[in-house]
């Protein structure tokens, strides 16, 4: 249950962060904004590491295997860039829908094929149908929502 709550908090924070980052980009540049996001995240993480008792030695990073797992930070820089770009291009709601939909599809494929050391999971029609329903849901043109007979 705590995992679900933390995931919900993460989703809410990501939505707010994306809007903040997009606004900073409008006033600076996308790479400067992305760099600031990464640097500020680094500072927060280092402070948290010091405050919480420094669990894990810095040298333990050299023992991470496989080494490509250390690319998470570099991927984070491109995530920051692409989120900022998409929010500026198509807005926060559309961006979130596409981002989350692709995350679900990719996560399912990673599990299905056992990529990156994740335990391989068997194919399940219900998961495939669920993914298809999500993709179909975002494929419906956004403008159709304005044609609704019920206006709230």
Question: Where do the language-model regions lie?
Answer:
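Loop-to-transmembrane-helix transition segments
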Residues: 3-8, 59-78, 126
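Structural motif at transmembrane-helix junctions in multi-pass transporters
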Residues: 26-30, 82-98
